Structure formats: C-alpha cells, structure tokens
Design a protein with these regions (language model features):
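Acidic/aromatic-lined carbohydrate-recognition and catalytic surfaces
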Residues: 23-218, 222, 235-295, 427
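Bacterial N-terminal signal peptides that target proteins for export
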Residues: 1-9
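Substrate-binding cleft/loops of secretory-pathway carbohydrate-active enzymes
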Residues: 136-146, 289-323, 394-406
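Bacterial N-terminal signal peptides
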Residues: 9-18
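Solvent-exposed beta-hairpin/edge-strand motifs
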Residues: 525-540
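Core domains of carbohydrate- and sulfate-ester-processing enzymes
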Residues: 143-188, 322-339, 410-447
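C-terminal beta-strand-rich structural cap/linker in extracellular carbohydrate-active enzymes
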Residues: 546-564
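Loop/helix patches that line or flank the sugar-binding groove of alpha-linked glycan CAZymes
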Residues: 37, 241, 245-263, 271-281, ...
Length: 564
C-alpha cells in the first residue's frame, strides 16, 4: 500500500541529493553525475562458448565481433570476456602463461584489437577478466622461479621449507582438493597454490610483482580495454608466518577437513593492492569489478574502500544465495544491498553458478519465472551483469557420466562434485544441430533446449524471454526512475507478491512480482495517495492494473508508471 508515500517522498528527495553529491566525485561523469559504468548493462561472455568463427568447435574473438550487433540490439553497454590470455588451459584460462597476448585458440591480438574497435563504434565497452593472484606453472616467471633458489624470479612466488622433512609448511588446503603446497625436489622447497598445483600463487609482497601487474593493466588499457574483472581478489595475500588455519570439522567433496581460511584469505594488505590498481584505472576512466565472495554487506563494503577508492563494483552474490522465490528473502537481500557504501552490482548467474532458469524454475513455469527474475534485477538501482544466454532461458545441463566431464573440478570431485560444464554450454543462436554456434562438433554438447530456446526463434516471438529482456533493457535505459530512483518497499508482510516503488523526484514506477503459482490481486490504494492509475510499462501474460488494483498471473510481472 502507498499510505506512507507522501511522507516518504520528501525523505527520498533528500536521499537523492545525497546520492548524487557522492556520485559527483567520480572522475568522469554524465550530466546526472554518473560514471559510465553506473548506468551500463554488463554482459558476461564465456569466449569458448559464445560464437565460433573458424569452425574448430571453440568460440573466439572474431565470433564475438560477429555478434556485436546482436548485443547492441539487446541493450548491452559492456562485455566482460572471461580469461582469453595464452594458457595451458588447466583451468580454462585461469592459469595464465602470458598476460600480454591472446590465446591462439581465440585468435590473435589483432583480432582482439579489431573487436575492441568494432565494439567502440557501437558504444560497447570491453572488460577483460584479469587473474592477479596466480599464474600458470608454465609462465616464464615461474619456470625461472623454480630453476634455482637464487633465480631472478624466485621471490615472485611463495616458496618455503617444509615444517619437517616430508611435510608441507602448514595445513592449508587447495580449494580444489589436497594440500595447497607442492614439493619441488630440484630446489627442495614447497611452493604455494590456492587453486591447482599448476596455478602457483604470486608473491604480492614483492614490489616487483605489484609493479609488473599494474603495468600489465596499463598495457591493456592502451589497447582499448575499459576495465577489468579481477579474479579472486580476496586471496592476493597470505599470512607471512604461515600460521595453520583452524579446522572446523567435517569434510568436503575431496575428502579434506573443512577449514576456516583465516590466514590465507581476506588479509588487510589486499586493500593496498586494490588502491594501487584503482589509481591506474582512474587514469583511463576504467572500471574495476572484483570477485569478492563476502559473507555480508559489511564485509563487501571493505572492498569499495574508504572514499570509494578501491573497487567500483565489488561483485555482490547475495541474490545467488536465494535459490527459491521468496518475497521475504529478496526483501532482506535488497535492503542489505541498498545499505552498501558504494554502487550496487547485481548477479544471478555466471560461469561458476548454475543458471537461474533452473535454480528458480519449478519445471512448469520456468519461462515466466525467468521473466520475473529479469524484472527483479533489472529494475533495481545498480549495475546488472547478465550471463550469456540468460536472456534466452538457457538451462544448466549437468553431465551424467564422468567421462563426459571437461571441467577439472568435476573430474576430480566426481560424483559429489560434477563441475561447471552445465552452465558453460554453447550459446544457442538457432535450432540447428550445433545451435548456430559452430559448423563442427562444439567443445561441449549443445543442450536439447536449443530447439526451443534460441535467438532466431525467440527474436520472432513477442512473448519470448528474449523479447521481454529487450523490452526491459530499453525501459531501463530510458526511465529515470529505474536508473536513479530510490527504492521504497511495499506490502512487506505479503508472502506471495514482492512489490516496490522506484521514486525519482516526484515520479514513481511501481514494480509488482508474483512469486507464487496462483493468481494474485493486490490493492495499492493509488487514488488515496493522489494517483489516478498505473500505466503499464511492461507486463507478462494478462497481468494488468485497473484503478487501485494490480492483477497478476501466476509468476506474473507488472511494471507501471504511476500517473496523477
């Protein structure tokens, strides 16, 4: 209900002024005081799986370039490309062997530069996935580092003697199973690897490492990159005394005892490194997105930095912790996100998280629920990051046999851990044998859902998920209330309908989302609060507004402009 609207609108106006004043501190802003990335819609591209231009079964730079018009038409402002640097591909590019080139499987540096130029012509920014914590064990730095204890790059990595002969320096475990220490018999020391043994951690306490990594970002900025998504930024530093982590009981999928990662994650020194990376980014009006797995908003706030001088967009995964349609849970998460000290970010799926189509779907109304979830995270204040194929309703397709698994996590953790292949399948461009992704067998199988959920077919259907995404993104780009308006929750005891206002100056947009499988009719008391009606901006099915009431289909959406 809107009974408190008149009193609240004054407070909202004051808050709007405060928010705009804070935003005006941004180095380069638009007329409304916003940096380019604040109003942008980001789109994550997994390059192996997006578009294959040379028909080798693997996506590439030229494939991405060929789909720029599609992305522009969708409403995308920035593309985040997951790792594309040269790599042995032990962990699909998160093991980098050269930070200043493109992996041949994806094309050449010239291909990338062409992509950046073509994207710029369309007003699309390019964001690269940058892995600052570790390299490949095939990187020239590490090959030199392990060559002798006195090599020039020895201190670029973390080498230590064993606690006693035959035992690693401490009890730290790798996130992918087993000890986080690998013994090198040639130099009789262990090196540290938070991830796989083929991904040795860099020593960020070494000033030469820090300077080199800063310089690498400059190298890419000069080639047209508008920012970086920083992988695993919370683990850049480790306790120099290598204290054992507390053991918490129980065992993970790899059989290791669970630990509290007290001494090898989230150390305070991380923030100094982030401030350095941000200083370089500001020279180029670039954005830094951070992979920050935080337990709550208070911890997330640390990564914005004092005075917002670290990450502009620390990734908030709070929505991914709500895997059911619960108005109460989403109200709680939205309130937490809106209390953050910096600009919010919204993510509901990515290359490490099962697709939202399956996580929230009930098996019967999945298409409607996909539209509902889009309506939620695209009508909130902040920067949304879409995962490729979300706009189609792509499904998570989990392998059923170990021999079909490509992801090393799935191969080593099977059957308890089946890996991430399911959310990395080829983009579904049409209903052909390989979904228009390639003319040869793709690196991962195309899901059966490509027959019904693909770009070609959905582009022709005005009621498709894709058509609804296009409508929402167009609305988001043009509606000031959705871009900058404050959030005002409504009917907070309603267990079936999540509803709220986005209020900007004296204008308001009503968002009503039915998170139940039964029709709902909600009285918002519009006339009592000085409004004649709610004019539909976007709605699903037969969801509509009449007088004070909004009627919603099962899992229905109504987004309306309040009119006086």
């Amino acid at each position: 209900m809107l009974s408190k609207f008149r009193r609240i609108v004054v407070v909202v106006l004051l808050l709007s002024c405060a928010v705009l004043n804070a935003q005006n501190r941004a180095k380069t802003v638009d007329a409304g005081g916003h940096a380019w990335w604040q109003h942008a819609v980001f789109y994550e591209v997994y390059p192996r799986s997006f578009a294959d231009s040379n028909n080798d079964g693997v996506g590439d730079m030229n494939g991405i370039a060929s789909k720029l018009d599609y992305l522009k038409d969708l409403g995308v402002d920035a593309i985040w490309i997951t790792p594309c640097f040269p790599s042995p591909q032990v962990d699909f590019g998160y093991d980098v062997s050269n930070y200043e080139d493109i992996d041949p499987m994806y094309g050449t540096l010239a291909d990338f530069e062409n992509l950046a130029r073509e994207a710029k012509k369309r007003g699309i920014h390019i964001i690269l996935d940058f892995v600052p914590n570790h390299t490949s064990d095939q990187h020239p730095w590490f090959l030199d580092s392990k060559s002798s204890r006195t090599s020039a790059h020895r201190d670029w990595y973390i080498w230590r003697d064993g606690k006693v002969p035959g035992q690693p320096p401490n009890n730290w475990t790798s996130t992918f199973g087993g000890s986080a220490w690998k013994f090198d018999p040639a130099t009789n020391q262990y090196y540290y690897h938070y991830f796989y043994a083929q991904q040795p951690d860099l020593n960020w306490r070494n000033p030469a490492v820090e300077k080199t990594m800063f310089d690498i970002t400059r190298w890419w900025y000069k080639r047209g990159v508008s920012g970086f998504r920083l992988d695993a930024v919370d683990i850049l530093f480790e306790d120099p005394n290598l204290k054992d982590n507390p053991v918490t009981g129980g065992r993970n999928a790899y059989g290791d005892a669970y630990q509290e990662h007290k001494y090898n994650t989230k150390l305070p020194e991380v923030h100094q490194a982030l401030r350095g990376l941000r200083k370089v980014a500001d020279e180029y009006n670039a954005v830094l997105i951070g992979e920050t797995w935080t337990k709550d908003i208070a911890e997330l706030n640390l990564y914005y930095g004092k005075g917002n001088n670290e990450l502009q967009l620390p990734m908030d995964f709070l929505f991914t912790t709500v895997n059911k349609l619960s108005p109460a849970e989403f109200r709680k998460q939205i309130a937490a996100i809106n209390s953050a000290s910096g600009w919010p970010t919204f993510v509901i799926s990515n290359h490490d998280i099962a697709r939202s189509y399956d996580r929230y779907g009930d098996g019967q109304h999945n298409d409607d629920i996909a539209k509902l979830m889009a309506s939620l995270y695209l009508t909130l204040r902040g920067t949304p990051i879409l995962y490729y194929g979300e706009e189609l309703g792509m499904k998570t397709t989990v392998p059923t046999r170990r021999e079909d698994v490509k992801d090393p996590i799935g191969r080593s953790g099977w059957p308890k851990e089946k890996g991430r292949d399911g959310e990395r399948t080829p983009m579904q461009w049409d209903e052909s044998v390989n979904a228009g992704f390639s003319k040869t067998t793709p690196w991962l199988p195309v899901p059966p859902s490509a027959k019904t959920h693909n770009v070609a077919d959905e582009s022709k259907d005005p009621n498709s998920i894709l058509s609804f995404y296009k409508k929402l993104l167009k609305l988001r780009h043009t509606n000031k209330e959705l871009l900058d308006g404050n959030y005002l929750p409504l009917n907070q005891s309603d267990q079936k309908v999540l509803s709220y206002l986005r209020v900007y100056q004296d204008q308001a947009v009503l968002v009503a989302l039915n998170m139940s499988g039964t029709p709902q009719r909600v009285n918002f008391e519009l006339k009592r609060n000085g409004f004649a009606s709610a004019r539909a901006l976007a709605a699903t099915g037969k969801s509509s507004s009449q007088g004070d009431f909004v009627t919603l289909d099962p899992y229905g959406v109504f987004i309306g402009q309040l009119e006086r």
